[in-house]
Amino acid sequence: MIQLDKFLANIKNYGKNNYIFFEDKRYDYVEILQISYSLARFLESYGYRKVYSNLKNSPLLVSLYIASWIADIDLFVPINPRLVDNELAAIVDGDSLFITDKISNLEVNKLYIENATCFFESLEYTQDYITHAKALTAHVSSGTTGFYQKYLHKIDQIIKYANDRIADLGLKQDDHLLVALSINHAFAFSYQILPALAIGLDITIIREFDAKLVARIINQNSVTALALLPIMYHFLLEQNINKNHNLRYLSVAGDVASISLVTAVKDKLGLPLLNGIGMTEVFGYGQNISANTVNKVKIFSDTEVKILKFENSNYGKIFIKNNMLPLNIETEWLETGDIGSFDHQSYELSFYGRYKDIIIKGGSNISPFELETAILKIPNIDNCIVTSKKDKIWGETVWAYLVASQQYSLEFINNQLRNYKAEYKKLDGIIYIDEIPITTTGKTNRKKIKEMINHE
């Protein structure tokens, strides 16, 4: 409770000089904190021990997070606002309060909030400033494994994480942060809202990502810092952005940013994309604060890394250990599902992709990301994705889907790859397409590509 009390005291001390901007309104930190206490008492009045919410971004959602730490409840679960009732049914427990701004037929106890701003401003100020600091926060996995897993963290873990990130992310005291990704997303929560509150930054929040709106805010306001998923940067680059913008900091996480995207961002915005890396289970655990190679990330000093190397290889499965390991995971080392190598001197992790995407050809492990990085060095190839095709002899063969303004032969591409990669990693086939498919979360849809190549 001491950590939380200090955190809340800091928010109060930032007082009326720092703001959260939303649509045409602004709220100072004192208002945000006061509403958080009022909201905590409001939640307690319902009598439920568990609270779920899939609200879109607003100052109300920021206060709801803080209120969950203050209130006498046991569990707070923020949920992706894009999920539909069928998916929500697998997440939301019956004996709980579900706070939503969408019409839902879910058979649970619902608090429907039609207008977050009106609700926020209508809450009466409480004089009860008791802080209980007992609820666990559970961020939810994306469901790609077939079920939704809740990862539990104590308030002390979260507050310590926020304080530890103050100097790690490259944010500065006078930054103005634009939050365009759902705050219920672990990336936006851990890399944006938490450190911004800990530092005392001005924050502009938009309800949900809209490339035109983001561009307009960048052009009109004093926003200096932005963090998005790779696909969001693609959409943002299609907009008109003034060359005299005030941006100085661009972070990217959620998926590996391609060389072509990094180059395009640098050309248009004049800034490097700074890679971050993390998981829903442990939040972010690494972030570059200066330009680096595309697939390298500086790991936070409070995170230990272990690599279980593949045979005859300098890279392998990535395991991590830090203070953010979820309470409901009984393991000392967390397997990330990623593959890479780690430099203990520079404390940098080289990331080569997901383990499930590794191609095993004739017993040799081949990283798609490693090949994609090399392929994108060939002129006129704008984007690519490398995948495996089932083969009776080799087990798997190596194929690439290419988006290119000039079509090359397989032989030509393999000749180019010899400058970068060993012979056994050469491509067995290429297919030209108009665009690389993406998932609903904006990531490269490797599953669909694998199904396409294998006619599944």
Model-derived features: where do they sit?
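Conserved AMP-binding/adenylate-forming core of the ANL superfamily
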Residues: 8, 13-45, 58, 86, ...
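AMP-binding/adenylate-forming catalytic domain of the ANL superfamily
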Residues: 421-444
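Conserved AMP-binding A3 loop
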Residues: 28-29, 133-163
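Gly/Ser/Thr-rich phosphate-binding loop
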Residues: 225-227, 237-294
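AMP-binding/adenylate-forming core of the ANL superfamily
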Residues: 306, 311-329, 333, 339-341, ...
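Conserved AMP-binding/adenylation subdomain of ANL enzymes
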Residues: 159-176, 184-225
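Conserved AMP-binding/adenylate-forming
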Residues: 25, 39-82, 180-182, 365
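AMP-binding/adenylate-forming catalytic core of the ANL superfamily
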Residues: 41, 339-425
